[in-house]
Amino acid sequence: MRGFIIALQFLTRLPMPAPLRTIVVDDAAFARSMRWFPAVGLVIGAAVAGAAWAGALVDHRLGALAALIVWVGVTGALHLDGLADLADASGAAHKDRERLLAVLADPHVGSFGVVAIVLQLLSKLVLLDMLVDARAFGALVLVPFAARIGPLVWTWWLMPLHQGLAARFRSAIGPIDLAGWAAALAAAAWFTPALLVTPLLVLWWGWHVRRALGGISGDGHGAGIELIETGLLLSVAITGLWIHTT
């Protein structure tokens, strides 16, 4: 339970009761908390789905907007920052890996990063509108959960790019953790079959960052979570349209 609280504090901006804010967190406990990332995804998903449902009582477009605002607010735009950093680095590197890594280390956001954030938010808004209109609130709970299985796989599979978050987490994730969350994903896919594309998206992003960067970093995790969330929203939307037309 301690690991879940640590993960919740790290991945969200949700207010915590005073006793939970005083939990002592050392490097080992912080690393072990990664096992709980998918569970935190369920909390995020529940908040997003709740906002979508409440907004949809007025109009499905308001539901989509409310869901997006809560999604960004609850996570503190943590993963959008990683997406922006990688977009800036990829855009400025011109296929030069050393320059890519140098730009990645720059904390400032450039034009490529701004464009990436805008496109990501617009994509989510459009897809959320489709899902809210279809009353797919259960899928909204599960998408953030499924996307946060990705960091466990990348941490176990890929070498850390530098001595940062990825390096801390690597020693704490093992096959048992992956098997447990894979079983949970399979159970979730029974209710939302569109989640079956999750392994493909996770493997695609891992292959991409290994080829482009040579390993995984905190920015790689954040960008991957964002892109997989959007990919899963798209999968749910397409699956819903296919079911509706057959």
Swiss-Prot record:
Topology in the lipid bilayer is annotated as: Multi-pass membrane protein
Give the primary localization class.
membrane
Q: Give a Gene Ontology cellular component term annotated to this protein.
A: plasma membrane
Q: Which residue ranges does UniProt annotate as crossing the membrane?
A: 37-57, 64-84, 100-122, 139-159, 185-205, 223-243
Query: InterPro entries, per this entry?
Result: CobS
BP terms from Gene Ontology: cobalamin biosynthetic process
Q: Where in the cell is it found?
A: Cell inner membrane
Q: In terms of domain of life, where is this protein from?
A: Bacteria
Q: What does this protein do?
A: Joins adenosylcobinamide-GDP and alpha-ribazole to generate adenosylcobalamin (Ado-cobalamin). Also synthesizes adenosylcobalamin 5'-phosphate from adenosylcobinamide-GDP and alpha-ribazole 5'-phosphate.
Tell me the protein's name: Adenosylcobinamide-GDP ribazoletransferase
In the UniProt record, the gene name given for this protein reads cobS
